[in-house]
């Protein structure tokens, strides 16, 4: 909850801005908690982007995007909330490479189609991330 405390102090008495929260690994736990807390304070969440938040339930009334270093992490994490769009590295990469070298990570962008099926498109993590922020 340190994130939320920081935001409360920074924006005390001001109009609360819309936030895009980017989180990595164990930080995803604090990020999803802060996102919910921010909304309870009257703020808006534009998106939450979770890099390798394995085992963290991600549910919200705002866009959530999961990024995983391999297919197993992608699949097993999706049981706790898929999010709107997701990406997994294929071939698998080291956990830290997601953060360190997104331009070198190749994998699959996964989105739900209008008929509820998954669409898989190959791209780099950098391309996927740029699409999210566009």
Task: Describe each PLM feature range.
Residues 2-86:
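Serine-dependent carboxylesterase/thioesterase catalytic core
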Residues 1-16, 67-75, 81-134:
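Active-site catalytic motif of lipid deacylating hydrolases and related acyltransferases
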